[in-house]
């Protein structure tokens, strides 16, 4: 099932309860969708450990010495453009819709259908040096768990490491990782249903919130995030005077949820996303954009209609983004950063382990294809330069 739903919550207004019913409706939808969320990190980890020795045999010289074009199998979450392949200078990209692809494994040869049901064959023994796997938003799907296990076990280069994608897809684990390396991020706390079910929940909840601002004030604004949301889903802002009631309402629907509550920064000139490749100690900046919120929404997700433009990082900002990307262990990620107007410091907002192409919504099919093609040309060129 496609998970391209959008949470239309707008709880950023002073009167948060005006739109609370919208949030509850969409929250219920997310809960229903959770039954499709599947992870098997133990199986993936075992596969990675079993393949560790084989991976070491894939040397840089082997990648550099190939006499064929590299084939990039791009598992996109859904079919977004009417194209099956795109030929770059050194790479042929084959687009596969990970939510609807069919596959068959016989004699160590994996057969998968692309967007237009053309059969793509991958020899898990002989194609290891000329095929790279890029799975965007595929790690939460049953079939993709199986496929990625097979590719990783065989020793293919897989973007991204399944063990690391689990961390980046969980906002709390990401926050803990940033803490481990003392990387600037908004002050935060994690809240569970038990925190709201005490004898004096108001008093106890204030103790939880106090470290974020150093005080408890009804006008303090907080960014609240469901841990596994993406694309702006499950993210809302509320004031201190409303936060306990709203959180209690969420837990009354699903008391197994955990909610990350963050300090709301005064973001200067929109946020910044740096697309960073990291491999064997080498790093490349694929591109960088700054995103502006749209329609009075505080979120800057392109999928929600925000605008963006190219952004030139300063040396300090580039060094910061590269350091964050390296610490995640991800081969490719989007590092979302912002500059706080009050402190003028650079902060990490989120780390995206499966960043989408920076292409605006609402384009014609022809222009949409053109801009995606330009991005993938740039991406594959950077990818090949870092693999050599």
For each of these PLM feature ranges, what is it?
Residues 219-220, 228-320:
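Phosphate-binding site of ATP-dependent enzymes
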Residues 262-263, 272-273, 330-342:
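A short glycine-rich, hydrophobically flanked beta-strand micro-motif that places a catalytic Asp/Glu
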